[in-house]
Amino acid sequence: MSSYGGGYQRDSYRSRGGQGGYSNGNSYGNGGGGGGGYGGGGYGGGGFGGGGYGRGGGAAGGDRMSNLGAGLKKQEWDLETLPKFEKSFYKEHPDVTARSQREVDEFRQEHKMTVQGKNVPRPVETFDEAGFPQYVLSEVKSQGFERPTAIQSQGWPMALSGRDVVGIAETGSGKTLTYCLPAIVHINAQPLLAPGDGPIVLVLAPTRELAVQIQTEITKFGKSSRIRNTCVYGGVPKGPQIRDLSRGVEVCIATPGRLIDMLEAGRTNLRRVTYLVLDEADRMLDMGFEPQIRKIISQIRPDRQTCMWSATWPKEVRQLASDFLNDYIQVNIGSMDLSANHRITQIVEVVSDFEKRDKMIKHLEKIMEDRSNKILIFTGTKRIADEITRFLRQDGWPALSIHGDKQQQERDWVLNEFKAGKSPIMVATDVASRGIDVRDITHVLNYDYPNNSEDYIHRIGRTGRAGAKGTAITFFTTDNSKQARDLVTILTEAKQQIDPRLAEMVRYGGGGGHGHGGYGRWGGRGGGRGRGGGSTASNAAPLGNNRRW
């Protein structure tokens, strides 16, 4: 405990560079709830307002990809003249030191943990062994956690040591806290922000939803040391984000596109960043953010500490780590091969497009017998997400949809309704396949099979989180047959039953090609658009008289 000394806790609101306090409470959560009120009538009655919403826009909101970062000035770093900073805080607990190497090896083996790199610290088995200062420890214990997850056991000593870190772990493994708590310790060891300073900690995330989830954790655990944060992402007005940045925040959680917008406009800078986190690095690369990530990192001093977190370890992620991390240490939880969470029961049904709707209803009838269940339904396109939602609502099911064309306030409202169980059926595209942190999702249904096995793993990983069990149901058509072999490999590794027709596709080599997933059922590309008047209309469709739940 004393290894951090007593001086890291920020005193009171000590002006943080003259900015003063929490600035009307806005520093937390400008990314979240948007303020509007949808309960009193917007949805279900007259729709989501007569105009404005449903204009289309584009999935990424402010995160346009074209020529982002062209206006950023190239930074020349002279390490001799840069201010020094602290990043090594870890002191091994006597109980950890006392364990034999055999005990350490057995612990790692039991938790399917492998480590790589020089002088990797030993894992800790309790929160006290991590050696966090009391102000961090009390926040953790107040949340009722019993013991660290596997990634936390090994990741905390690694991150607190000041080394560059790579962590590979399944979704729902507790990785957010693995970098958040060391970030809080790191901030409290640095000089206070001066006017004009940018953040000390930068967290890059692929989606708005994940960014808001991270902000919630940072806010919760940074409260006692009065650490301010903001969430910077596209699809919402820039004004509140600009205000937060100008007042000064120690932590900035951002999607790459909107952050570059802010940097190019001179709204913030990254000169003070000494702790950089790349969360879901594989997903950011999948989404085409690599050029933006490279431009952002070029604005950060090279002797920073960098932590990279990913669910998979493909060659593109390995290359990024090689380019931007120095002498890094790595922890992998689980197999390095693509694998699914073994607490999830996977049911794959080979169907035709025309069977999907009826089969979905049969599953819903069974699942919703238990009113505490929550189901997340994934579709291949935004159009199908809206059409299914409209169909389900008209059939009496309390369904809402979320995807990239919906404005941020609507997305926040839908997520809150789903979390609260008021609308226990949520239909989503892959914009929601990561970053949605709803811990009690009991079922996932893949109405359309995703484009690749990685997305399949991440979709079904929305259930079975935090030690719970879950069920994933997947509709697989002949159009998906080129992916049959990969899917069978995943099912076999997780010891799941395999539909004989799926095995047959593998045996005969498939050959369906890339079809349109679920379009057939809905009568072609034009069908259904006119009824609703924009993407929002699906959530405004009145519930049918035949209430199914």
From Swiss-Prot:
Localization annotation: Cytoplasm; Nucleus
A single MF term (Gene Ontology): RNA helicase activity
Annotated region described as Disordered, given as residue ranges: 1-41, 523-549
Membrane-spanning residues: none
Example GO biological process: rRNA processing
Record EC number: 3.6.4.13
Domain of life: Eukaryota
Domain Helicase C-terminal: 359-506
Entry binding sites for ATP: A169, E170, T171, G172, S173, G174, K175, T176
Record motif DEAD box, residues: 279-282
Domain annotation Helicase ATP-binding: ranges: 156-331
CC terms in the record's Gene Ontology section: cytoplasm; nucleus
Reaction(s) catalysed (UniProt annotation): ATP + H2O = ADP + phosphate + H(+)
Key words, A-Z: ATP-binding, Cytoplasm, Helicase, Hydrolase, Nonsense-mediated mRNA decay, Nucleotide-binding, Nucleus, Ribosome biogenesis, RNA-binding, rRNA processing
InterPro entries recorded: DEAD/DEAH_box_helicase_dom (IPR011545), Helicase_ATP-bd (IPR014001), Helicase_C-like (IPR001650), P-loop_NTPase (IPR027417), RNA-helicase_DEAD-box_CS (IPR000629), RNA_helicase_DEAD_Q_motif (IPR014014)
Family indicated by similarity: Belongs to the DEAD box helicase family. DDX5/DBP2 subfamily.
Protein name per the record: ATP-dependent RNA helicase dbp2
Designated gene of the protein: dbp2
